[in-house]
Amino acid sequence: MQKSYGVALESPTGSGKTIMALKSALQYSSERKLKVLYLVRTNSQEEQVIKELRSLSSTMKIRAIPMQGRVNMCILYRMVDDLHEINAESLAKFCNMKKREVMAGNEAACPYFNFKIRSDETKRFLFDELPTAEEFYDYGERNNVCPYESMKAALPDADIVIAPYAYFLNRSVAEKFLSHWGVSRNQIVIILDEAHNLPDIGRSIGSFRISVESLNRADREAQAYGDPELSQKIHVSDLIEMIRSALQSMVSERCGKGDVRIRFQEFMEYMRIMNKRSEREIRSLLNYLYLFGEYVENEKEKVGKVPFSYCSSVASRIIAFSDQDEEKYAAILSPEDGGYMQAACLDPSGILEVLKESKTIHMSGTLDPFDFYSDITGFEIPFKKIGEIFPPENRYIAYYDGVSSKYDTLDEKELDRMATVIEDIILKVKKNTIVYFPSYSLMDRVENRVSFEHMKEYRGIDQKELYSMLKKFRRDHGTIFAVSGGRLSEGINFPGNELEMIILAGLPFPRPDAINRSLFDYYERKYGKGWEYSVVYPTAIKIRQEIGRLIRSAEDTGACVILDKRAGQFRKFIPDMKKTSDPASDIYNFFISAQAREKYGA
């Protein structure tokens, strides 16, 4: 930290990365009058940080805030509006409007914006109890005080803030946040939790899409606000229909069965040809559509709604789409969800550049090979790798070559074989198990072929239901079906015997879709490593992340089997992986041996 703007550490699950980083960063920053920002991807990761801070608070004074955006922390917004899309700017306008009304004497405009925001009682709860964001939201509901404004008011006194990546990597939001905190970027130390996700996070923040569904919402909005003329004989709804027809025609003519990469200018070409108008005329209409959206926002603001407009969102995105960089972005056209076009970010280093203005600590159990991480994120910093620290005999990892999840061989017989192997293992070994599938589709097809009871992380499961399922799993034991790279792949702790076995029902290769093909081409052009950077390394990271769920202490034992004949190629990333011809018996015998060692000390 003293020699570089950042450091990177790979260390196994359970080795104490979080508490080490927290204590080091807090000590380093306190000596230099700096602050600490801990960035997380999920609520479960935030909860783990809060848990570690609570343990540290017995030996050092810690003032922490679990900061999140208004979308998650505004009680009033959830009560008065039900938008499918929202942005930070619109919600900030809504909030400021309500605050002005309260200060003008209309306390009913927002019953949560009151003197309690700055009260000693609220601040004591925040700094003494060290609540999670969810716990502080509940506190706000119970006590009729705004959680977001209370956090903002307490920010200047905070030593450390825990926040989502997306919150800080949004430049406009970050600048306001830092201003409220009273610090500049060079006055903070940033801890990047589960940093192997940083490339995907950067790409996600840098990407956007225009869908038929968003156009339908814009159309309904136009009808609700008078559908005025934008130009001679062209109403708002007419322009939206022009856009929708062009998008649907492109999807119909270009996509076939799946998504395709197009040129960014192709959409504008379709618009010109189908509507017999010049690009200049179309851009002028889009500018008028944006202005109409601003009118809608003002009208919503007058009646106390969130000033967000689907029309202005569509207009700004289409203009941005047409002007996008063909080198670092890919224009993707997809028939999914009714059809959409997407500007997919291929190079996240520009999005992540702002992090270099602060000291950074990059932590993960899977940063190696670091050249891959460094190339993609743009961070050329010192890297240290800590090897396995727990007894090797406590872990069994193998792959079974009797099945494969390869798409062109995955027929009904192969699915039957995979289901039979999974069922044999579950019924013979009888341990708490998560079965990870490469996709929801494969999970559904295998699930129909097994007879044992199990729980399931289905597509779109909400946080409350996920936590309820995990609580039942920990209490009653059993089996969960989940998806690789999903919410149960990382960031959730399973100490002791809460999780003893993992089955990877196929390798979690990236989907061979247009985005991943574009990533392959980009990395091949830039580094000559298209296959490694777009397929091999991301797959190896997912496998290692899932294996990392098993062992968290020297007393834990766990087994993992990969049901895919292609898994042998990943031995260089998992040196202790064996090959098995009878996974059920081999795993059963492993646990029998582990029990004998525990009983007799052998």
From Swiss-Prot:
Residue ranges of every copy of the Helicase C-terminal domain listed in the record: 421-602
Pfam family name, one: Helicase_C_2
SMART domains from the UniProt entry: DEXDc2 (SM00488), HELICc2 (SM00491)
Effect of D564N: 10-fold decreased ssDNA-binding, 15-fold decreased ATPase, no helicase activity
Entry-linked InterPro entries: ATP-dep_Helicase_C, DinG/Rad3-like, HBB, Helic_SF1/SF2_ATP-bd_DinG/Rad3, Helicase-like_DEXD_c2, P-loop_NTPase, RAD3-like_helicase_DEAD, XPD_DNA_FeS
UniProt GO BP: DNA repair
TM helices/strands, residue ranges: none
E.C. numbers: 5.6.2.3
Binding-site residues, ssDNA: W531, R566
The record's free-text note on cofactor binding: Binds 1 [4Fe-4S] cluster.
Alphabetically ordered keywords of this record: 4Fe-4S, ATP-binding, DNA damage, DNA repair, DNA-binding, Helicase, Hydrolase, Iron, Iron-sulfur, Isomerase, Metal-binding, Nucleotide-binding, Transcription, Transcription regulation
Cofactor: [4Fe-4S] cluster
Variant or mutagenesis effect after changing Y407E: 55-fold decreased ssDNA-binding, 10-fold decreased ATPase, 3-fold increased helicase activity
Consequence of changing W531S: 500-fold decreased ssDNA-binding, no measurable ATPase, 3-fold reduced helicase activity
Annotated binding of [4Fe-4S] cluster, by residue: C74, C95, C110, C146
Reactions catalysed: Couples ATP hydrolysis with the unwinding of duplex DNA at the replication fork by translocating in the 5'-3' direction. This creates two antiparallel DNA single strands (ssDNA). The leading ssDNA polymer is the template for DNA polymerase III holoenzyme which synthesizes a continuous strand; ATP + H2O = ADP + phosphate + H(+)
Keyword Ligase: no
Protein residues bound to ATP: S11, P12, T13, G14, S15, G16, K17, T18
Motif (DEAH box): 193-196
Domain (Helicase ATP-binding): residue spans on this chain: 1-247
Molecular function in Gene Ontology: 4 iron, 4 sulfur cluster binding; ATP binding; ATP hydrolysis activity; DNA binding; DNA helicase activity; metal ion binding
Alphabetized PROSITE patterns for the sequence: HELICASE_ATP_BIND_2, HELICASE_CTER
Family note: Belongs to the helicase family. RAD3/XPD subfamily.
Reported function: ATP-dependent 5'-3' DNA helicase. Thought to be involved in nucleotide excision repair (NER) of DNA.
Name recorded for this polypeptide: ATP-dependent DNA helicase XPD
Species assigned in the record: Thermoplasma acidophilum (strain ATCC 25905 / DSM 1728 / JCM 9062 / NBRC 15155 / AMRC-C165)
The organism's taxonomic lineage, starting at the top: Archaea, Methanobacteriati, Thermoplasmatota, Thermoplasmata, Thermoplasmatales
